Amino acid sequence: MKKLLILGANPETVSLILKAKELGYYTIVTDYDPHAYAKSFADQAENVDAIDSDALIELALREHVDGVLVGVAEALLPTYCEVCKRLDLPCYSTVDKFGIMARKDYFKQKCREYDVPTIKEYRYDELEEGCYPVIVKPVDSCSSKGIRICYNKEDVENAIPYALRYSKSRKYLIEEYMVGDEVVSYYVMQEGTPIFVGMCDRYTYKEKGDLVQLPNSYIFPSVHIDSYINYTDAAVKKMIRGLGLENGSLFFQCIVDKEGIARIYESGYRLNGAQEHLLISRVSGIDVKKLYIDMAVNGKVSDLDLESMANPKPLKLTCKLSPLVHTGKIKSIAGLDEINRLPCVVSVNPSYREGDIVAGEGTLKQIFCRFYIVASQKKILKDTIDQIHNLLSVKDVNGQEMLFGLFDTSIIDDRY
């Protein structure tokens, strides 16, 4: 049995581990945290720090691994590249390309070079009364960490040190704070060919004034998909080719402006923590997890013609529902088994167990679970989400309900 070494063991890595096991591989997962969530799903769990390349090499040689994978943690990509290179194992890209796509400032510069619509930036000394509100963020962080919305210069002065706390390079970005629909577009690359595979509407809930909005639902296909295909897709594909991104997957977070044009502000050149691949595989047969696994072992993502399989405008509605919870310690969780038995629910991916502590207010750490739904009609989708909301309960040590900001299903009637 061939062995795969998977770097990082956060909850979002579980689906990758399960897919590798389904395909017949022996899975070794490593993370410095001995209690990391995904470890219990692997065949073998190690406590080697996934940024310690020397220790990872030693582990890989000792276990005679046949391929190396990284889960969803962007910070592990440079180590992943080094480990693959030193072991002479396939790697889906290079450190310099990961660096461009992971650094928000570098990435946005490439967007401008290739005429990809993006969001206006400001230097600190350019800020004037008419610029506000703006958003301050680290150039090299993810999962909504280090981000603040600012309504005046004093807010900006307070937000900059906060952003720098989450920036390895000690750099920040100031952008126009756009109000509009949020969308996410998805691509896979096969031997240099970029393939548009899906696009969703990203719905969010905003709890406090200076905190960013957190996603509580993604719905495919996006109501803006035709506009995206007409105004943005060609430029994005040109950029992907120009940057030499040969294999793997990409996601782009965008805001739709008043003219209906999707403006890209962030990218991810990896498996997405939102795990939209669980839905895209259901409507197209393209399973991004399998592409990464095949690349790790065989050096190519697929022998299939992925472009002919792509189905970015499926007839079915699909949804990633991600209920939010307040910070605190979880005492009890109810409803997951019943939800898992609902006919349209194709996957249930919790982030926490009873006894876990939810920290990181205003970040994606407040997502309690991700539910994946495939429905043939919008009424069925709406009813399924309402059922999930009614069944699910997460209570803290004081017996208080921790769930908040649930997705408003009336939106489905209004927009789809």
Predicted segments with their positions:
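ATP-dependent carboxylate/phosphate-activation module, predominantly the ATP-grasp catalytic core
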Residues: 177-179, 187-245, 249, 256, ...
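A conserved helix-loop-beta module that forms one wall/lid of the active-site cleft
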Residues: 85-146, 153
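A short glycine-rich, hydrophobically flanked beta-strand micro-motif that places a catalytic Asp/Glu
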Residues: 175, 246-258, 304-307, 403-408
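ATP-binding N-terminal substructure of ATP-dependent carboxylate-amine bond-forming enzymes
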Residues: 1-97, 299-302, 308, 313, ...
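A glycine-rich beta-turn/hairpin centered on an aromatic-Pro dipeptide
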Residues: 301-343
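Conserved ATP-binding module of the ATP-grasp superfamily
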Residues: 117-119, 133, 147-181, 199-200, ...
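A structural supersecondary motif
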Residues: 250, 263, 339-356
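Short acidic-hydrophobic, aromatic-tinged amphipathic segments that line or gate anion-handling sites
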Residues: 45-51, 121-124, 150
